[in-house]
Amino acid sequence: MLSDVWSLNGRYRTLHLTWFAFFLTFVVWFNLAPLATTVKADLGLSVAQIRTVAICNVALTIPARVLIGMLLDKFGPRKTYSTILIFSVVPCLLFASAQDFNQLVIARLLLSIVGAGFVIGIRMVSEWFPPKEIGLAEGIYGGWGNFGSAFSALSLVAVAGFLSFSGGFELPTGAVLNWRGAIALTGIISFVYGIIYFFSVTDTPPGKPYQRPAKTAGLEVTSIRDFWGLIGMNVPFAAILSVLCWRLQKVGFLTSSTYPIALIAVLAWFIFQTWGIIRTNIELLNGTKIYPKEDRYEFKQVAILELTYIVNFGSELAVVSMLPSFFEFTFDLPKAIAGILASCYAFVNLIARPAGGLISDRTGNRKNTMGFLTMGLGFGYLLMSLIKPGTFTGSAGILMAVFLTMLCSFFVQSGEGSTFALVPLVKKRVTGQIAGLVGAYGNVGAVTYLNIYSLLPLWMGGGKDPSPEIIAASNSAFFQVLGIAGLIVGFFCYFFLKEPQGSFADAYEGEKAENYV
């Protein structure tokens, strides 16, 4: 497969069209970060308000990934991806035309839905590549598409400067940035590509049927024990959404009257999810349907993959958010230099995620690969906890810190590739919903870790204005939390995760090898 990666024919054409769709959704989803300070200054926002807007950027991604997983299994990836791409122009234009804080929040909440597009391509790629090649294919999709976030960070300021001929906001330095034009442009490009994608791909290769579950209101499970496991694993979704509501209330966006309404909405979502699961599995619950052995799967597999995505992708989102300020504080660097050094963490994704999938394909044991990479990220974060002011000094110290960061990033993002090398192998007909659940847990991890990061200085006695010593200690403790979590989940992978049947087969269960030629 490696020799054919650059081909633009057949399944490789579909792979490249699909990773670029993911790339654009991440460009759109992350189009605020590089322009945040300009937006803040232009609209006169407070620090708390711009942070609230950033929180809203992930608020609906969790339920959206679950919902899109359901729609994906029902309507197919071609229609679902095209719809997400076309939809993205609406919140982008709303954000670009916003005149106050509330309008920004509404637009950002809608944009958080676009961040759920990732799960769609997991199903699309699995339809075009056989089990023996799925690791590398999903790794390329995830790694190259995920670079959209870094591309956004590297290019949008320049784009906003280029568009300044039509107006913009003048910075204290005298530079003019048309942030509204840059944000709008990302949505327009995504809209156009959504139409192109719709007419350029098919859900499956010619002659291959698209496997759909009989019901898509909730994930289909095959035993009563798995039913209760699924219900239990949905509780953290409601819990983390409640935490987001609490954060929005703390910064004043949700008032004493709207905060309870938001919590009721979260409860309603949980009830909706639970009822959908019951409806989908009602025949299993009342005993009128018993799955034959060859059609069963263990939900435990899904639960462990959800945990792996917490510690790899969840930690990635959290670390990417704090790493520039971490380097700036630890080594007393200018913001620009700190940002460049921190970007090395994201750049590793281009190679590491495909590498994780390739390792999973080549080792002959996807379970052990998952365990090894997860343990590796655990030890990597523990090594990063040693990076403190005074511990690494001078240019050599900075280089060592960057090396440790990139080493840790390799295990983190290879682990992401390994996770989604396993997802399509659990149960093919519900791959979309499984990908949605696993992907949503990545966001659960990110929100959890970011809340821990923001609260650690307070827990360590720093108050509202912590000392440099407290900040350094809290940064170290944060990496230790990430590391210990990785080691625990790595242990689960080694001792509780099972190798899926047909992990390296020429075709999925019920399909023919010639479908993938």
Report the location of each language-model feature.
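A membrane-interface helix-boundary motif in multi-pass transporters
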Residues: 161-187, 247-261, 454-486
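C-terminal transmembrane helical hairpin of 12-TM major facilitator-type secondary transporters
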Residues: 366-418
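Glycine-rich segments within core transmembrane alpha-helices of 12-TM secondary carriers
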Residues: 135-164, 438-450
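Extracytoplasmic gate region of multi-pass secondary transporters
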Residues: 32-36, 230-263, 300-343
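Primarily marks hydrophobic transmembrane alpha-helices of the MFS/SLC 12-helix fold
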Residues: 81, 104, 369-370
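C-terminal membrane-cytosol helix-exit motif in multi-pass small-molecule transporters
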Residues: 187-210, 234-249, 266-285, 489-498
